Amino acid sequence: MARVTVEDCLDNVDNRFELVLAGAKRARQLAKGIEPLVDWENDKPTVVALREIAAGHVTSEILTSTEESAADSLSLGGFSTADVEAEVGGGPVQPDPGASQERAFDEAADGTAQGSGDPDPTT
């Protein structure tokens, strides 16, 4: 197995910083089960990702892709993020406005209310 060098990879990405970002993103995809584009020779996902970049199979375009990756789809059981959000009700969870009032009432009833200013509420 030939050693992958930064110079080999820089032919296919603009600079070292993009190389790190593209390599990390591709390594995460490989770790999640995406099919590698080069032979997997008992290497770690980061090495395979760099070998794919050096071979020209993966470029910095991986950083700007807006579509969901197949790895994300696999982790959601084949459903898109929108499908999952629609199933569980979508948007952010709204707080219950009565919850803080109920808590204050409960604390007052059992004597655990904070901020009364009197260290001994029995006097």
Curated annotation (Swiss-Prot):
GO molecular function list: DNA binding; DNA-directed RNA polymerase activity
Keyword Nucleotidyltransferase applies: yes
SUPFAM superfamilies: RPB6/omega subunit-like (SSF63562)
One Pfam family here: RNA_pol_Rpb6
PANTHER family the UniProt entry points to: DNA-DIRECTED RNA POLYMERASE SUBUNIT OMEGA
GO biological process: DNA-templated transcription
Species of provenance: Halorhodospira halophila (strain DSM 244 / SL1)
Protein name in UniProt: DNA-directed RNA polymerase subunit omega
UniProt KW keywords: DNA-directed RNA polymerase, Nucleotidyltransferase, Transcription, Transferase
Transmembrane regions: none
